[in-house]
Regions:
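Histidine/acidic-residue-rich, glycine-tolerant segments that coordinate divalent metal ions
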Residues: 1-88, 92-99, 184
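Metal-dependent amide/peptide-bond hydrolase catalytic core
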Residues: 59-238
Length: 238
């Protein structure tokens, strides 16, 4: 897009946790950055009756999963808001055989750009060192990286857009909401240009909309989309 003279940018994301007819426009961090990781712990297979003749990768993999929480809790800034989730863990096929390999994967979410690289470094260091203590080694999946930066809204864009929107639709359309721990590719635009992303409420119990995102019952109160159009116009006309 370098051939286009872009001043700033704006986007909306529908949000199940806000009522239809409300929109959230706030400066600063709004959606989380994402570190993703997939870790293979490589050992040496053998019979379950003689663990001393094998190098059981299940043991260090289990320790790593527990130690990652401790590492982040004790080495990250206590004022940083972040989460860590292990979402996959698997190893072995049968009860009496030590496998060659164990695997786990997961994600960490955070709201300041420097935090992502530090979280990633801590994950890699913890995995490598704990595996080494148990005579094993680790291999990381290619997607073990900072996958998304946090969405951080520009104050000037937010204030100007919100002012125009309230002139158009009234102050009652502005709603309050905290941080959203999901991640969003719009961060790539915000890394290049000043801009903002707003949350557009779509929940309406009378229509049955408001189930969580990616839930099979997720639905939208389409009447809320008109407010979204007004917000986009407000950004363009401010």
């Amino acid at each position: 897009m370098s051939e286009y003279p872009i001043d700033d940018c704006f986007a909306l994301h529908v949000y199940n946790d806000m009522p239809a007819g409300k929109i959230n426009l706030v400066s600063g961090p709004r959606m989380a950055g994402a570190v993703c990781f997939g870790v293979h712990v490589i050992g040496k297979s053998g019979h379950g009756s003689r663990p001393d003749l094998a190098k059981n990768p299940v043991i260090p993999a289990s320790h790593i999963v527990c130690e990652l929480d401790s590492a982040l809790q004790n080495q990250m800034n206590a004022e940083e808001t972040l989460t860590l989730s292990i979402c996959v863990q698997k190893a072995g096929e049968i009860w009496n055989a030590i496998p060659d390999e164990a695997f786990f994967s997961g994600t960490s979410r955070y709201f300041s750009r420097p935090a992502g690289e530090k979280v990633l470094a801590l994950i890699k260091k913890t995995c490598t060192n704990v595996a080494d203590v148990h005579g094993c080694r680790v291999e990381f999946e290619p997607y073990t990286k900072v996958l998304m930066e946090p969405v951080i809204n520009d104050q000037e864009v937010v204030e100007e857009t919100a002012q125009k929107l309230t002139q158009m639709c009234g102050p009652q359309v502005l709603g309050e909401h905290g941080l959203w721990f999901a991640s969003e590719t719009f961060c790539k635009y915000l890394n290049k240009y000043p801009g903002a992303l707003g949350f557009l409420g779509i929940a309406n119990p009378d229509l049955g909309s408001g189930a969580a995102h990616h839930n099979s019952r997720f639905d939208v109160d389409e009447s809320a989309l008109l407010l979204g159009v007004c917000a986009e116009l407000s950004f363009a006309l401010r």
